[in-house]
C-alpha cells in the first residue's frame, strides 16, 4: 500500500485538517495510518507545531525527530551550503522508514506550498519522488486562479498526483466548484476527491491567540481565554445602529475604541467572545461588571482600531485546528465530504 503526501499551493489552506482527518478516517476502516511531516518549520519549541499536534491527537509513540526530521528556521538559508543541505534528504528518508515500520501507511503533510524547501532540494516534488509517494493536492478556494495551481501541480507531479480536494469553499461557491471546476479538471485527467466547505468552527480563533497577536492585556476574563471566536466586527458606528449590527454575528470579537462605552455595552448585549478595546483605555466599572456577568474577556491594546483590525485580519481566514475541541468536527467533515474509500482504493 502506498503512502500519501498532502500537498498545497498556499499556506493555511487545510493540509493539517485533511492529514489528521484522513488518518482518523483510515483508522476507522482498519488501516493503521501514521503521520509524517518530512519538512517542518520551528514553532514554539524546537519541533514543528503541526507535527506535535498530530502526534498528540493520533497517540503516536514515534520520536518527534522521526515524525518531522528536518525543521527549517531563520538560519536555514545561511546553512544551506553545509550540513543542513547535504544531510537533509537522508534524514527525511531515515525518519520515513522508521515511522512507516510501525504502520500500514503514512499520511505525510507537506509544507505550506509545494515548492517550499526547493533551495535545499526538499520541495514537495523532491520528496514525493524520493520516497515514492502518491500525492493529494489541497486547493484552498481562490476562484478560477486555483485551477492554474492545480494544473501546474499536475504537470509537475504527473502520475504521482492522485487528485485534488477543494478546501475552504464558501457556501455560495459550492455549486460552481462541483459543477464547473471539478468537471473541467476531470476532462484534464485530474480526479476530485471531495469539497470541504468553509467551516466557522475550524476557522475560529482562541481568545488567547487574539490577545497574543495584538500584544494586548486582559483587563477581565483571562479565565475564558480558550473561548473560540468565529469572526470579528469593528465598532465604529452610531449608538442607535450598534445593537442590530452586533447581532449579525455570534461568537465574535468586537474591536472598538476604549472610550466608546455606548458601543461596548451594546456589544455585551449580543453573543460575543471578547472585546478588544483600543487606545489603552481602561473601561469603567459598569463595563467590567457587565463583561464579567456575560463571561466575555476584555482585552486592552495600545494601538488604534485600524491597527487592531489589521492584526485580526491576519488571524482569521486560515484553518486553525490545533485545538482538541475541533477534532470531532474534522473527522465529521472528512467522512461527509471526502471520498475516503475511493482514495484508499487508489493507494492500493
PLM regions with names:
Residues 99-102, 243-252, 267-271:
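Flexible, charged surface loops at secondary-structure boundaries
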Residues 3-5, 32-34, 52, 104-106, ...:
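Structural motif
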Residues 111-194, 259-322:
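Conserved catalytic-core segment of NTP-binding enzymes
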Amino acid at each position: 500500500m502506498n503512502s500519501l503526501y498532502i500537498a498545497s499551493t498556499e499556506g493555511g489552506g487545510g493540509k493539517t485538517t485533511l492529514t489528521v482527518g484522513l488518518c482518523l478516517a483510515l483508522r476507522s476502516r482498519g488501516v493503521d495510518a501514521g503521520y509524517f511531516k518530512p519538512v517542518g518549520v520551528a514553532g514554539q519549541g524546537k519541533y514543528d507545531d503541526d507535527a506535535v499536534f498530530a502526534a498528540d491527537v493520533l497517540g503516536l509513540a514515534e520520536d518527534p525527530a522521526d515524525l518531522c526530521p528536518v525543521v527549517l528556521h531563520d538560519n536555514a538559508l545561511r546553512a544551506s551550503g553545509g550540513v543542513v543541505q547535504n544531510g537533509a534528504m537522508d534524514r527525511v528518508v531515515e525518519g520515513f522508514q522508521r515511522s512507516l515500520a510501525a504502520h500500514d501507511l503514512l499520511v505525510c503533510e507537506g509544507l505550506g506550498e509545494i515548492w517550499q524547501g526547493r533551495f535545499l532540494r526538499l520541495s514537495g516534488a523532491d520528496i514525493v519522488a524520493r520516497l515514492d509517494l502518491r500525492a493529494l493536492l489541497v486547493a484552498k478556494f481562490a476562484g478560477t486562479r486555483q485551477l492554474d495551481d492545480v494544473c501546474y501541480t499536475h504537470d509537475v507531479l504527473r502520475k504521482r498526483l492522485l487528485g485534488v480536494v477543494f478546501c475552504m469553499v464558501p457556501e455560495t461557491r459550492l455549486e460552481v466548484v462541483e459543477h464547473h471546476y471539478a468537471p473541467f479538471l476531470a476532462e484534464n485527467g485530474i480526479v476530485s476527491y471531495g469539497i470541504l466547505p468553509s467551516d466557522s468552527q475550524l476557522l475560529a480563533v482562541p481568545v488567547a491567540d487574539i490577545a497574543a497577536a495584538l500584544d494586548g492585556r486582559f483587563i477581565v476574563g483571562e479565565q475564558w481565554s480558550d473561548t473560540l471566536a468565529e469572526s470579528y466586527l469593528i465598532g465604529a458606528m452610531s449608538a442607535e445602529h450598534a445593537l442590530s449590527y452586533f447581532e449579525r454575528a455570534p461568537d465574535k470579537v468586537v474591536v472598538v475604541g476604549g472610550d466608546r462605552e455606548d458601543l461596548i455595552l451594546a456589544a455585551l448585549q449580543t453573543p460575543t467572545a471578547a472585546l478588544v478595546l483600543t487606545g489603552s483605555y481602561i473601561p469603567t466599572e459598569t463595563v467590567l461588571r457587565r463583561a464579567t456577568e456575560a463571561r466575555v474577556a476584555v482585552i486592552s491594546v495600545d494601538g488604534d482600531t485600524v491597527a487592531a483590525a489589521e492584526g485580526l485580519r491576519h488571524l482569521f481566514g486560515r484553518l486553525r485546528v490545533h485545538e482538541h475541541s475541533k477534532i470531532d468536527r474534522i473527522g465529521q467533515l472528512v467522512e461527509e465530504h471526502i471520498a475516503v474509500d475511493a482514495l484508499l482504493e487508489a493507494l492500493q
